[in-house]
A protein has these predicted regions:
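Extended, small/polar residue-biased N-terminal targeting/export presequences
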Residues: 46, 60-130
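C-terminal, low-ordered peptide segments at domain boundaries
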Residues: 96-167, 218-223, 229, 309-325
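Active-site-proximal beta-strand/loop segments in catalytic clefts of secreted hydrolases
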Residues: 136-140, 173-177, 203-205, 244-248, ...
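Gly/Ser/Thr-rich loop/hinge elements
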Residues: 180-240, 278-282, 295-299, 305-306
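N-terminal Sec-pathway targeting helices
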Residues: 1-23
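Membrane-interface motif at the C-terminal end of an N-terminal transmembrane signal
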Residues: 18-36
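Short acidic catalytic loops
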Residues: 158, 162-179, 239, 243-244
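Terminal peptide-recognition signature
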Residues: 50, 93, 135, 172, ...
């Protein structure tokens, strides 16, 4: 027993010595690299961390020549002493990898974002000709659970009011929806969604994470994202739905469109969406700065992945959404709802 304990002690000691030697070697190499760009070790490690996050997590990471990118970015950061001195280099990296959905924000910018009170337009709804229900959802930059619940209540109040007219034909207008909190939007629209699984996030390794709507709750996988404070509501009639999309339908607005994609009795009208059909995730750096990156693609319930934008079933050449009966996209939607 004594020799066994001694052997274990010797092995642990050797392991610790190896770790110390490796750490010392790594530190020496890091200092050499930092010196080669006339950077402080702190600034170099900070920039290295940001680049490593991009290389490992960015949704299009496998299409990028990272050695070339890093060479140019480190050159941009030459002379950096403080972590903040590397910010222009991080922005350059975002530009070089063509990252245009997320952002990089300094600690002071993050403080302003957290304090900013976002205002959002409530949904517009009304009954159109031929007993067609019209519901338009705008951008919803959620800031709290309280705001999410208020938004969900507004959307469901609109749906219940329209459904009281015994409608079975619906127009969901997403042409002015540039994103925000997809879960609040999907929760509000729950009565119009016909399946529990309404879409997926797709990781770079192919892993699928389902979007679920059930019993007035929306989930990402098995994790609850938002639960309604209202009782569940069921439509009086099986809905036939026209979804309107366009160039300003972006991010979470595209997620809502994807949730309806593949549902029976649904057709899309308008123009191609913005092309931000992916999920973003915030990565916080050591000084409090935030690197927001797109990390997962959207897929509809049938497994169709949207790598860029989403195309309508019927392209309508109209400039912008007008929310009026003279709107060619609304006219086309009404024609399909009532005649096909």
């Amino acid at each position: 027993m004594y020799w066994r304990k001694k052997k274990i002690f010797i092995l642990i000691s050797l392991l610790l010595i190896c770790v110390c030697l490796f750490s010392g070697y790594y530190l020496k190499i890091t200092i050499q690299k930092a010196n080669s760009y006339s950077m402080s070790t702190k600034a170099f490690l900070y920039l290295q961390k940001a680049l490593n996050i991009m290389e490992k997590k960015f949704i299009y990471k496998d299409t990028i020549d990272w050695d070339s990118i890093k060479k140019e970015v480190y050159k941009k950061a030459e002379g950096s002493v403080l972590t903040s001195d590397t910010y222009p280099a991080i922005q350059l990296a975002r530009s070089l990898i063509k990252e245009n959905h997320g952002f990089f924000a300094s600690p002071s910018q993050m403080e302003l974002l957290e304090k900013e009170e976002f205002r959002f337009e409530p949904p517009i709804y009304r009954l159109l000709e031929k007993n067609v229900a019209y519901l338009s959802l705008f951008t919803f930059p959620s800031t709290s659970d309280e705001a999410d619940q208020a938004y969900n209540k507004q959307v469901q109040t609109a749906i219940r009011a329209l459904d009281s007219s015994n409608v079975d034909k619906w127009i969901i207008d997403l042409r002015k929806n540039q994103g925000g909190n997809m879960w609040a939007m999907l929760l509000g629209l729950g009565p119009l969604l016909d399946k529990e699984c309404i879409g997926f996030f797709i990781r770079n390794n192919g892993e699928k994470i389902p979007w679920k709507h059930k019993k007035n709750t929306v989930k990402q996988g098995n994790s609850c994202c938002l639960k309604s404070s209202l009782p569940p509501y069921q439509l009086k009639n099986t809905p036939k739905i026209a979804v309107l999309i366009g160039n300003n339908t972006a991010s979470s607005g595209e997620a809502v469109a994807v949730a309806f994609s593949g549902q029976k009795n649904v057709r899309f009208f308008g123009q191609h969406t913005s092309g931000f059909a992916n999920a973003t995730y915030p990565f916080f750096l050591s000084d409090g700065a935030c690197l927001l990156l797109p990390v997962m693609h959207f897929s509809n319930r049938l497994g169709q992945i949207f790598y860029t934008n989403m195309a309508p079933d019927e392209v309508i050449n109209a400039n912008e959404a007008t929310n009026s009966l003279k709107d060619p996209t609304i006219e086309a939607a009404i024609d399909w709802l009532c005649n096909f």
